[in-house]
Amino acid sequence: MNAEHSPFRHYLDLADARLGSQVVAVSDEWFAPASRMLQAGEPVWKEGVFDDSGKWMDGWETRRKRFEGHDQAVIRLGVPGVLKGVDIDTRFFTGNHPPAASLDGCFCAEGDPDDSTSWSEVLAAVGLQGDSHHYHPIDDERPWTHLRLNIYPDGGIARLRLYGVPYRDWSNQPPGTALDLAAAVNGGRALACSDQHFGRMGNLLNPGRAINMGDGWETGRRRTPGHDWVIVALGHPGSIEAAVVDTLHFKGNYPESCSIQAAFVEGGNEARIEAQSLFWRELLPAQKLEMHQEHRFERHLNALGPITHVRLNIFPDGGVSRLRLFGRPQLP
């Protein structure tokens, strides 16, 4: 199963350091710090680069174990979530990768786990190969705040991706509070798009403003009639009161204009949603865009009531760094 065809690749990487995820405990990180496993970028190889500990590696690497036991790292998720799948990535680790790994999880209402914390198995021990992705689906609806990666007995991991859905107790949401319902940290997901040649669609929903052009969604130059689009599932149904389309960092490659369609979708799969999106109602009529600028739309929005999905259309192509949809959740 490769990266592009793994079904849980469309979920949020809950271990992404950009969400605030961090390593809070580690048994050993002699050769390379465990925090590198959580970096959003792809691992790289630096030929001939060494530091005081040895060969520089883009990931977490422990020393060779000369006694019983195994190494482990505890990750506090930036946002609690339900896992849908994992990728234990050993790229560039050859001859120094662990033969096996497993995952445990826990839910801490406050703080970090301690010696009295009860851990549950999330992924039983699986075999690992060097310089490879290792994709494993997770069929477990329990939310976690912390994950513990166990490697047997030692070695290096380039990246740990923990794909899932952010967990939020919407019943405790104060009535009338407006939230960014498209935000990844609130459960928003990019489902499909016409093109993502230069920047992945999921970047639109990342926290904060984009750090550079690569941290947004950007399509290839369109050489045929039509326009580009992306479909986003909101984290929770709600009525949208303001939309923000941010073209930060996009200057000679921003869209000329954009529009937003929306619908309340019940049931169906992603293929059906994509096919029907062309006929969704208009939430935001076509609006002119400017380069490197945050555009906020309020009075231009049509009152559609509660919705679950939106389709952002950009004309004809280009890049958008962030999409924000502020609204009031539809609570029971």
Curated annotation (Swiss-Prot):
It comes from Pseudomonas aeruginosa (strain ATCC 15692 / DSM 22644 / CIP 104116 / JCM 14847 / LMG 12228 / 1C / PRS 101 / PAO1). One of its GO terms (molecular function) is allantoicase activity. Its EC number is 3.5.3.4. Keywords: Hydrolase, Purine metabolism. SUPFAM superfamilies: Galactose-binding domain-like. InterPro entries: Allantoicase, Allantoicase_dom, Galactose-bd-like_sf. It catalyses: allantoate + H2O = (S)-ureidoglycolate + urea. It is an enzyme of class 3 (hydrolase). This is Probable allantoicase.
